[in-house]
């Protein structure tokens, strides 16, 4: 789950991580009032959307007086920002962060992520702050420094100091930088984050180390023990189909193709998308119905897939392990009748009671094309959608 920058900074502040003072605003008047309350000579007006690249898209402006705050707030609120992370459709700006300006001496990058290859959290840092870390990794990988953290003992002071020295934090500010990184790590672990990214981390003219931006992502599977974080969820920033899917424990991610996919298991879902691409088709979505593919789940999955007007056909690829193929077949038939499906539908079943499942499909009287294998199913649906 993602949260907004201002929310992320509030979380970090509670862990002793230094961030600029700021207030969220939902209207132009609130933005001006927030700037008045901050009482600083310079304010930064920042669009709050769940995407990076806001500055380049015109979503971050420096205001030197209240008139400029009003002008920038009017120009940003309600507009659609298009960045490299939003896609061409962009995201509408519905809230702003009004933040005190600071005298930036140097920008850095600091981030915590899970390294799946080593099964450890890794602290990454670079003195090339303010730019995309992927860009730095591609052009100057030697400027990225990493510390792998033993989960049994957590981030150690010597590791944070080594990072601070490697990215050339001024010696007199190393202590602050170490405290910053230790607090960031505590927040990452205690709040079950999957990403904690500070870009940029800055040193200021008055000798401070602080987070000028903050991106926190949380493990959705752990939200049951973080009610405070769950309350920060902004449904306006999420895809409506993904929200609907989550109500039925379906994992749905929209894509740009025209072949709807309904699969049980994330691995099989990815393999299904791969084989559709292999036969020159384009998947319209990733949709994992999970192990308990009930008739209700299958019906809702069909509805979600069909809400995408680009879908020209559907490929159902189910392995009946926990679920029996005959039960799945009955669910597919019931769902097909309920939604009044008129698009081409190819179904591939394998596993427990597969022959009975195929028999049920064949005797349904519905226009369902049975596939003998995953490859056969992919070829058939690609052919049917033309």
Curated annotation (Swiss-Prot):
Entry's Gene Ontology BP terms: succinyl-CoA metabolic process; tricarboxylic acid cycle
EC number(s) from the headed UniProt entry: 6.2.1.5
Pfam families: ATP-grasp_2, Ligase_CoA
Membership in a protein family: Belongs to the succinate/malate CoA ligase beta subunit family.
Pathway(s): Carbohydrate metabolism; tricarboxylic acid cycle; succinate from succinyl-CoA (ligase route): step 1/1
Reaction equations catalysed: succinate + ATP + CoA = succinyl-CoA + ADP + phosphate; GTP + succinate + CoA = succinyl-CoA + GDP + phosphate
GO CC annotation, single: cytosol
Stated name of the protein: Succinate--CoA ligase [ADP-forming] subunit beta
Residues given in the record as ATP binding sites: 46, 53-55, 99, 102, 107
Domain ATP-grasp: from-to ranges: 9-244
Cofactors demanded by this protein: Mg(2+)
The encoding gene: sucC
Keyword Nucleotide-binding (UniProt): yes
Organism whose genome encodes this protein: Bacillus thuringiensis (strain Al Hakam)
Keyword Ligase set for record: yes
């Amino acid at each position: 789950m993602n949260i907004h920058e201002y929310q992320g900074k509030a979380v970090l502040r509670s862990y002793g991580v230094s961030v600029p003072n700021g207030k969220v605003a939902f209207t132009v008047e609130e933005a001006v009032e927030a700037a008045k309350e901050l009482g600083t000579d310079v304010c930064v007006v920042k669009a709050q959307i769940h995407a990076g690249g806001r500055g380049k898209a015109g979503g971050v402006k420096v205001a030197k007086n209240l008139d400029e705050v009003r002008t920038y707030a009017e120009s940003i609120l309600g507009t659609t920002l298009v960045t490299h992370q939003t896609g061409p459709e962009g995201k509408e700006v519905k809230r702003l962060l009004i933040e005190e300006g600071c005298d930036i001496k140097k920008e850095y990058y600091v981030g915590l992520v899970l390294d799946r290859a080593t099964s450890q959290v890794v602290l990454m840092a670079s003195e090339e702050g303010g730019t995309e870390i992927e860009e730095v990794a591609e052009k100057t990988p030697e400027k990225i420094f990493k510390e792998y953290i033993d989960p049994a003992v957590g981030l150690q002071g010597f590791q944070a100091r080594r990072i601070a020295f490697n990215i050339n934090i001024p010696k007199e500010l190393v202590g602050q930088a170490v405290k910053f990184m230790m607090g960031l790590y505590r927040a990452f672990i205690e709040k079950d984050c999957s990403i904690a990214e500070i870009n940029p981390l800055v040193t200021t003219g008055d000798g401070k180390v602080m987070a000028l931006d903050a991106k926190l992502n949380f493990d959705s599977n752990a939200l049951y023990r973080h009610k405070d974080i769950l309350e920060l969820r902004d449904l306006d920033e999420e895809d409506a189909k993904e929200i609907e899917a989550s109500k039925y424990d379906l994992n749905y991610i929209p894509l740009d193709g025209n072949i709807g996919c309904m699969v049980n298991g994330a691995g099989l879902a990815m393999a299904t998308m791969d084989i559709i691409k292999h036969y020159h088709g384009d998947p319209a979505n990733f949709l994992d119905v999970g192990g308990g593919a009930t008739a209700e789940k299958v019906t809702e999955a069909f509805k979600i897939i069909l809400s995408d007007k680009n879908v020209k056909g559907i490929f159902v690829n189910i392995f009946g392990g926990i679920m029996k193929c005959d039960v799945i077949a009955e669910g597919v038939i019931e769902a097909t009748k309920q939604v009044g499906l008129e698009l081409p539908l190819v179904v591939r079943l394998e596993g427990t009671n597969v022959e009975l499942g195929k028999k049920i499909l064949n005797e349904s009287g519905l226009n369902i094309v049975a596939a003998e294998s995953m490859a056969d199913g992919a070829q058939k649906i690609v052919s049917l959608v033309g």
